[in-house]
Design a protein with these regions (language model features):
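Short glycine-rich anion-binding loops that position phosphate/pyrophosphate groups of nucleotides
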Residues: 140-142
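Thr-Gly-centered strand-to-loop micro-motif
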Residues: 88, 175, 197-198
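Short gly/ser/thr-rich secondary-structure transition/capping motifs
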Residues: 115-119
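Generic enzyme active-site microenvironment
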Residues: 32, 174-175
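Acidic, Mg2+-coordinating phosphoryl-transfer loop and its flanking beta/alpha structural elements
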Residues: 190-197, 202-203
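Acidic, divalent-metal-coordinating active-site segment for phosphoryl/phosphodiester hydrolysis
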Residues: 178-190
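Conserved N-terminal beta1-alpha1 strand-loop-helix module at the mouth
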Residues: 1-87, 92-100, 104, 111-112, ...
Length: 216
C-alpha cells in the first residue's frame, strides 16, 4: 500500500494548522514540506521556524524536502525542528558533501533521501543509493506547485527501482509533481511507493475519497 503525502505547498498558509489536521482526518500518511531558498530554485517557501511550529501540530511524519543550495549547512537544524524524513537534491552540492550530509541525517536518527530533477539521469543516483532510505524522483521541475506531470520520468523510476533492488532493497521511491487521480497509477506501476500530491489533493471535492483512490 503506497504512502500518501499531501504537500503543504498547495495548502492555505493562513490556515496551515487547519489544513494539516485535514490531512490527518482524510487518512493521508505523511505531511510533505517543500523548503525552497530562491537560489537552488527561483521560488522561496518556508524554513526551519515553520517546520518547528508544525511538529506539535501533527503526529504524522514530516517529509521535509530541502530544495536548497548546499543542504548540509541546515540539515541538523531541520532534524532538530522535527523532520522525520529529510530529502536533499544530489544536484545541490559536491558529491562528497552530499554523501556527508546523508551520513549526518542518518546519524541523527532521521530518514535520509536524495532527489533527482527531471533532467538528472537515474545513473547519477548510484553513488548515494546505499546510504538512502528513499529516492525522490521529481515528475515536474521543482520550485512551483500545480505543474503538469512528466510521464517520461517513469522509465527513470523503473530504472532506479531496479538499481535499488540490487544494492538497497529496503529503500523506497517517492514521486513528486503532478500526481493526481489519473497519473498515480503509472507511478505505482513503475515502482513508486510514496506519492506526493499537492494541488490535486487540496482541490479535490472529497479529499478522503481522493486519498483512497491513490491507494486503490
Amino acid at each position: 500500500m503506497p504512502v500518501i503525502a499531501p504537500s503543504i505547498l498547495s495548502a492555505d498558509f493562513a490556515n496551515l494548522e487547519r489544513d494539516i489536521h485535514n490531512i490527518e482526518a482524510n487518512g493521508a500518511d505523511w505531511v510533505h514540506v517543500d523548503v525552497m531558498d530562491g537560489i537552488f530554485v527561483p521560488n522561496i517557501s518556508i524554513g526551519i521556524p515553520v517546520v518547528k511550529a508544525l511538529r506539535p501540530v501533527t503526529s504524522l511524519p514530516l517529509d521535509v524536502h530541502l530544495i536548497i543550495d548546499r543542504p548540509i549547512r541546515y540539515a541538523e537544524e531541520f532534524i532538530k525542528a522535527g523532520a522525520d524524513w529529510l530529502t536533499i537534491h544530489l544536484e545541490s552540492d559536491q558529491p562528497q558533501n552530499t554523501l556527508a550530509c546523508l551520513d549526518k541525517i542518518r546519524a541523527m536518527g532521521c530518514k535520509a533521501a536524495i532527489s533527482l530533477k527531471p533532467k538528472t539521469p537515474a545513473e547519477a543516483a548510484i553513488p548515494y543509493l546505499a546510504k538512502c532510505d528513499m529516492v525522490l524522483v521529481m515528475t515536474v521541475e521543482p520550485g512551483f506547485g500545480a505543474q503538469k506531470f512528466m510521464a517520461d520520468m517513469m522509465p527513470k523510476v523503473k530504472k532506479i527501482r531496479q538499481m535499488l533492488d540490487e544494492v538497497n532493497p529496503a529503500c523506497i521511491i517517492e514521486v513528486d509533481g503532478g500526481v493526481d487521480a489519473v497519473t498515480y497509477r503509472t507511478c505505482r506501476e513503475n515502482g513508486a511507493e510514496a506519492l506526493v500530491t499537492g494541488s490535486a489533493y487540496f482541490k479535490a471535492a472529497d479529499r478522503a475519497a481522493f486519498v483512497k483512490t491513490l491507494r486503490a
